[in-house]
Amino acid sequence: MTEQKQVKKPSARRRARECTVQALYSWAVSGNTAEQVELAFVLDQDMDGVDKPYFRKLFRQTIENIETVDFSISPYIDRAFDELDPIETAILRLAVYELRFELDVPYKVVINEAIEVAKVFGADESHKYINGVLDKIAPALGRK
């Protein structure tokens, strides 16, 4: 008898975070407005299993607060923003937005979700970099 490993489906919020990272990446590299990116994303991507209201909130609020978010990240990265991988930038922006503004989400959940999203979309070791940066930012934001 063979055992099949059951693949656990990501939660609706995890899927919302994954979609938010993709949309933030698209927004950063395309030069399109947030509204254009959001509309195209919702029309073109598979949104099954996504907490759509949470996706919209995360995407819109991260961009609305981008200066504060980037200011919170800058002291804790080892290079200039334009030298970061755009996916890493999107993951950090989302996580820092959540750490700073979504206080009902425990900081450990935010960091773990960012690591898991980095494993899906980032380079081989990017989840380690994301973890290291967020481990420094969380206490600075009073979240540890």
From Swiss-Prot:
CDD domains: Terminator_NusB (cd00619). GO terms for molecular function: RNA binding. One of its GO terms (biological process) is transcription antitermination. One of its GO terms (cellular component) is cytosol. The keyword RNA-binding applies. Pfam families: NusB. Keywords: RNA-binding, Transcription, Transcription antitermination, Transcription regulation. The keyword Transmembrane helix does not apply. Involved in transcription antitermination. Required for transcription of ribosomal RNA (rRNA) genes. Binds specifically to the boxA antiterminator sequence of the ribosomal RNA (rrn) operons. Belongs to the NusB family. This is Transcription antitermination protein NusB. It comes from Haemophilus influenzae (strain ATCC 51907 / DSM 11121 / KW20 / Rd). The gene is nusB.
